[in-house]
């Protein structure tokens, strides 16, 4: 198995920006006519906590968190390059983000994904996320699936 390295950075990181561009291309295909609606909520300029995953020094995945409420961080911009999927990388990125959220005082993470991303929904459920009523800008949006996970005060290790 190749070595996976996760780094903490911010949204200005070049590798993060390149991975997000690939994510946006994927979402444009999946979301179709709904893409412009979702894209307005996926700006990265205000994101300060970013994880970039490298396998053998190649950027293969990313994710981010940003404050959602006083107690919840929102997981944003999760992506693993298609050539590196099904290796547990996404679960490791999410776990690293959850640990970072815990370190910064959050007690839960929330996220939004799409019904057209069944593999993402399955992953999040596998690692402890539960479907919750759509929140914020996603209220009433039929293609959105919102999820929540309470965080332990102890750091976690991925089990996926």
Q: What are the roles of these predicted feature ranges?
A:
Residues 57, 61, 88-90, 128:
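Conserved phosphate-binding and hydrolysis motifs of nucleotide-dependent enzymes
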